[in-house]
Amino acid sequence: MSKYISEQFRKYVAERANFQCEYCHIYQEDAFFPFHIDHIISLKHGGLTILENLAYTCSFCNSFKGTDVGTILFPKQKFIRLFNPRKDSWSAHLEIDDFVFYALTDIGAATIKVLNLNEVDRIIERRTIARN
């Protein structure tokens, strides 16, 4: 299937997410850079350009995620998939306290790792947004 995402799909995905990144939960209006439509399972891995495989993402989450679908977690040395906004409950895998993300599951840990959710600059960004 084509990697082209129609304007109709883009609008639907953004509205479905309430204009909020489906990974880090930052709102589009608070972000400096434009948001993206992400293939949850990338085309490279056989994902399709269908609504069930599209997520609304901030530029940082989209960039860090790339075509990844998971990662190896140590010390278990086990492949763990990333959080899937269409199939998973965010609060079942992740929580945030004082602008820092905490994993509740291996899926949460994999997502924090790959998306660099606790990178210092990202924590500072969340704190700055909260003050405004």
Regions found by a protein language model. Give the residues of each.
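Short, flexible, mixed-charge glycine/proline-rich loop motifs
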Residues: 8-16, 47-52
